[in-house]
């Protein structure tokens, strides 16, 4: 009887703890990957400015990159 109660309580508890740990680990890995490999590159930012008919300064490009990396933190 005690073994059944222990199994009945420990299995769902382990599943819940595992779900929380998995969630936080996956979020940490995802954020680290987004910092290392942002969804947009400096060349893409320059081409966006070129499509608008503007020539961006290096400061504008760096500002846009900082905005994207700040967003992923």
From Swiss-Prot:
Main location: membrane
Subcellular localization, as worded in the UniProt entry: Membrane
Keywords per UniProt: Membrane, Transmembrane, Transmembrane helix
Disulfide bonds: none
InterPro entries in the cross-refs: UPF0154 (IPR005359)
GO cellular component: membrane
Transmembrane annotation, as ranges: 5-25
Membrane topology according to the record: Single-pass membrane protein
Similarity comment: family membership: Belongs to the UPF0154 family.
Descriptive protein name: UPF0154 protein MYCGA5700
Organism per entry: Mycoplasmoides gallisepticum (strain R(low / passage 15 / clone 2))
């Amino acid at each position: 009887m005690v073994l059944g109660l222990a199994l009945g309580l420990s299995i769902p508890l382990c599943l819940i703890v595992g779900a929380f740990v998995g969630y936080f680990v996956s979020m940490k890995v995802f954020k680290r990957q987004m910092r290392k490999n942002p969804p947009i590159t400096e060349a893409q930012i320059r081409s966006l400015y070129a499509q608008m008919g503007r020539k961006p300064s290096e400061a504008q490009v760096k500002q846009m990159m900082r905005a994207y990396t700040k967003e992923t933190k």
